[in-house]
């Protein structure tokens, strides 16, 4: 990696915000794990009758296989969701509204119609300023026809003025719809990032070594 800088402002003790995916119950479906739990994400549209509500279901206890697991949040026909994996008759879905935060949870599989997406996107599809929850990733043209430059900023804000940040600055070549940073790094604390282009979404996952404590670039990004 060309450059990775980690800055700490008023560093204080804090508990890690992310647990390891290994060992999680099979019924877990949460936004913190979503960008890192699959390598085969899919796009789907919600289907249903006029004015039908397709509800999200919780992942606690014996959920989602119980009506008591039904949340208040719901989707309507033609809403677009990203699916990471299936669990029985359920799909773990991420819905990103035009404004506001995402909703992640179990959705009935029979209420989804999956879409075909390109596994070999054009170079231009990668280019631009991508944003998720205040984190930013900028992808530009590299010096060679098949390379891309990647810069980024991420932060985690704790109590008061306690802020931890991380930066990306590298060049890489996409392989299909994947773009990786630090793939050949061998150090225990080297930053590694995988970006997957899925339609208008950039699904980013890292190894939690790309910045200060609790900083991660993981998330589902969209162009500004």
Region spans (language model):
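Short, exposed beta-strand-loop hairpins at the edges of beta-sheets
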Residues: 194-196, 200-216
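Short alpha-helix capping/helix-loop boundary micro-motifs
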Residues: 60-70, 116
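N-terminal glycine/threonine-rich, aromatic-flanked beta-hairpin/loop signature
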Residues: 132-177, 205-207
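Sec-dependent signal peptide recognition
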Residues: 2-9
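Tryptophan-anchored aromatic micro-motifs
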Residues: 119-138, 217-224
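SH3/SH3-like beta-barrel superfamily modules
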Residues: 21-39, 68-110
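N-terminal signal peptide c-region/cleavage motif recognized by signal peptidases
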Residues: 14-17
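Structured surface patches comprising rigid loops and adjacent beta-strands/short helices at the edges
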Residues: 109-117
């Amino acid at each position: 990696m060309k450059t990775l800088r980690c800055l700490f402002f008023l560093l204080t003790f804090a508990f890690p915000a992310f647990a390891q995916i290994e060992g999680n119950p099979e019924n877990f479906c949460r936004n913190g794990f979503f960008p890192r739990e699959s390598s085969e994400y899919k796009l789907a549209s919600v289907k249903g009758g006029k004015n039908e509500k397709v509800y999200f279901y919780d992942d606690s206890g014996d959920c989602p296989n119980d009506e008591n697991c039904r949340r208040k949040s719901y989707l309507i026909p033609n809403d677009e969701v990203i699916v990471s994996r299936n669990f029985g008759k359920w799909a773990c879905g991420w819905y990103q509204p035009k404004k506001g935060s995402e909703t992640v949870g179990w959705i009935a599989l029979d209420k989804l119609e999956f879409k075909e997406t390109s596994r070999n996107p054009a170079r231009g599809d990668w280019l631009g300023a991508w944003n998720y929850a205040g984190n930013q990733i900028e992808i530009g043209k590299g010096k060679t026809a098949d390379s891309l430059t990647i810069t980024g900023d991420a932060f985690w804000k704790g109590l008061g003025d306690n802020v931890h940040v991380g930066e990306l600055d590298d060049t890489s070549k996409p392989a299909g719809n994947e773009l990786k940073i630090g793939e050949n790094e061998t150090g225990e604390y080297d930053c590694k990032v995988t970006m997957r282009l899925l339609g208008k979404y950039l699904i980013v996952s890292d190894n939690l070594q790309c910045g200060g404590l609790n900083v991660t670039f993981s998330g589902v990004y969209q162009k500004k």
